[in-house]
Design a protein with these regions (language model features):
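A cross-kingdom feature marking charged/low-complexity
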Residues: 109-121
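Hydrophobic side-chain positions on well-ordered alpha-helices
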Residues: 65-69
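Long C-terminal interaction segments enriched in charged/acidic composition
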Residues: 1-50, 119-215
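Amphipathic alpha-helical coiled-coil segments
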Residues: 88-108
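Solenoid-repeat scaffolds in large eukaryotic assemblies
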Residues: 77-78
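Extended, amphipathic, non-transmembrane alpha-helical segments
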Residues: 54-62
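Residue-level signature of catalytic and energy-coupling elements of molecular machines
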Residues: 73
């Protein structure tokens, strides 16, 4: 975070009504709220990192078991394990996508140095958080709930900044920016998955005799 926000550099005499309003909507009051949002977002990114690490370890374990089953010509076991690993990798991709999107969110939040930047900068972030929350709530319910609360906090900051500056939100631009963040994160996640994890072996046919022997 910048040590000093640009909107803090100038102070002007204010009426009593203005000072009362500032207690709720002032730029100075928005700064700690923004910093808290950054801190909470970073905490969720770390939680996703931990989840990704656990999934990666499970991935390696399953892959090794698949190779072992193939070496023993146990097609049925190999195929069952491969199906499980495929589901693990779907979850890994979801978590990685969310993690990369949160990384972009933190970077954007840390670049907000002027009050006038807030409405335009924060609006797409709220949309991204809403999408991420929907994708990971089934994997990490607590993280999904926390992201929803962060989004609510940022919405409050947007409303207060809008009241202070008189700026209005361009929803089309905000939605386009949100899609851009999510698309970029998805592209990077796809490439990282290809780079980090070996391709699953082809499904082996199970002979009728072997299948009967397993039942």
């Amino acid at each position: 975070m910048p040590e000093r926000f640009k909107w803090e550099e100038t102070e002007r005499p204010q009426s009593l009504n203005s000072r009362v309003k500032e207690a709720f909507h002032s730029p100075a009051s928005l700064k700690p709220r923004l910093e808290l949002a950054i801190s909470r977002t970073e905490a969720q990114a770390q939680r996703l990192d931990q989840t990704a690490q656990r999934l990666s370890e499970r991935d390696k374990s399953l892959f090794a078991k698949i190779i072992e089953a193939y070496s023993k010509h146990d097609a049925q076991r190999a195929n069952v394990l491969a199906s499980e690993l495929a589901e693990i990798r779907k979850t890994q991709k979801t978590v990685m996508h969310a993690r990369l999107a949160l990384e972009q969110i933190v970077l954007r939040l840390k670049t907000v140095t002027e009050l006038g930047d807030m409405v335009g900068a924060l609006a797409p972030i709220v949309g991204v958080l809403r999408t991420i929350k929907g994708s990971i709530v089934g994997v990490l319910p607590d993280a999904g709930k926390e992201l929803e609360q962060i989004g609510t906090m940022l919405n409050g900051i947007i409303m207060d900044a809008g009241q202070t500056t008189g700026l209005t939100l361009n929803f089309d631009t905000a939605n386009e920016d949100a899609r851009s963040i999510l698309t970029e994160a998805a592209t990077v996640a796809e490439q990282k998955m290809k780079d980090q994890f070996p391709e699953l072996p082809s499904v082996m046919p199970v002979s009728a005799n072997k299948a009967e022997g397993k039942t």
